[in-house]
């Protein structure tokens, strides 16, 4: 075990000098004492990022560096940052370096895995396409998720990404019955606490492992916590042969943390100030999230879109890795239609008749065609008004408005906001409901009857109450 000393501290970046002998490898962990964190010796973990020459390595800190002094003794561990893996990690909350943060004592895991791992080889990967039911109408109908696929929830600030990811955790984890891993990357501590309480109440916590590196953590922790979470998920896939759900909120913060550290490491920034290694870092993470012949990892990732600009390099780089995208739209949220999913810009490679069946495919395409026609008519309506439309176009507008409202749904995790019980809708009921609206069976019902209901039967019931 080699020892060195702190040479200089620049925010989250620490230079460490080793005299003679071997230098610790890139991505290996070092430990140093920081009295500001606690009185425990060697309580701060550093990760080697660069070799500068003359026995000096540049490292990124996983916790605060306030209180570190030059000349402080540093211990090279000779290993990477490791995470506790296996069933002992279920029901627990750990941080980026694998330490428990739920005040429930140590995680007595039999194994610790390094967080930097190689992606599965091509011959080990499984590629069969099957649909993952979410119980959310707009998702299942128009942009269905793939089992063992990668899904992105895109949206700007405050359009409902976290609520949607919490609903997906509740629906899929409860119905799915396998293991889940949640990585909280650079998001609000309050949301993490809410999620933990929610999971405890719903009984899902015993089959879930949570890994948190919240907004208040230094960029080093936020840039690595997704890898820690993924390592926990990989163990369940590779060793226990499980189908694992891996939730990440928010993948943008992973990129953001990398950008914060990049300049301090002396790299010249690329477009919009992001790190020049953006595509490489994203690829390294995303390529590990895949299905193998042993088991699968189905990943749902929330992606913050800065200033609602989808051409920003961070969301644009994420797009290329995904099987399905659920785009949350501010204009739809402004209409109070929740989940605020845009039915025309959300995509999925599973929207294919050979995978989801002819009936589902035809219904989804007909819904999109009707909504697109309605969108084209909006300009005419804005200038001339509804009265100038032909009878067939008036019918298009009327049915579109009903479909828009029927795409909304009361969520289980939002019951305290809506005052309505949550609804899980089976795909057969979803297709049946939208087909009936398209065929004009419910032209006589008021628009309001379709708002925040589950199945078409619920809408008919609501219409009776409204007319009573």
UniProtKB/Swiss-Prot annotation:
Q: Under what name is this protein listed?
A: ATP synthase subunit beta
**Gene source species:** Bdellovibrio bacteriovorus (strain ATCC 15356 / DSM 50701 / NCIMB 9529 / HD100)
Q: How does it assemble?
A: F-type ATPases have 2 components, CF(1) - the catalytic core - and CF(0) - the membrane proton channel. CF(1) has five subunits: alpha(3), beta(3), gamma(1), delta(1), epsilon(1). CF(0) has three main subunits: a(1), b(2) and c(9-12). The alpha and beta chains form an alternating ring which encloses part of the gamma chain. CF(1) is attached to CF(0) by a central stalk formed by the gamma and epsilon chains, while a peripheral stalk is formed by the delta and b chains.
Q: Which GO terms describe its cellular component?
A: plasma membrane; proton-transporting ATP synthase complex
Write the record's keywords in alphabetical order, separated by commas.
ATP synthesis, ATP-binding, Cell inner membrane, Cell membrane, CF(1), Hydrogen ion transport, Ion transport, Membrane, Nucleotide-binding, Translocase, Transport
Which top class of enzyme applies to this chain? translocase
Q: Which GO terms describe its molecular function?
A: ATP binding; ATP hydrolysis activity; proton-transporting ATP synthase activity, rotational mechanism
Q: What is its EC number?
A: 7.1.2.2
- InterPro entries xref list: AAA+_ATPase, ATP-synt_VA_C, ATP_synth_F1_bsu, ATPase_a/bsu_AS, ATPase_alpha/beta_chains, ATPase_F1/V1/A1_a/bsu_N, ATPase_F1/V1/A1_a/bsu_N_sf, ATPase_F1/V1/A1_a/bsu_nucl-bd
Q: Report the protein's function.
A: Produces ATP from ADP in the presence of a proton gradient across the membrane. The catalytic sites are hosted primarily by the beta subunits.
Gene3D superfamilies hit by this protein = 2.40.10.170, Bovine Mitochondrial F1-atpase, Atp Synthase Beta Chain, Chain D, domain 3, P-loop containing nucleotide triphosphate hydrolases
Residues engaged in binding ATP: 155-162
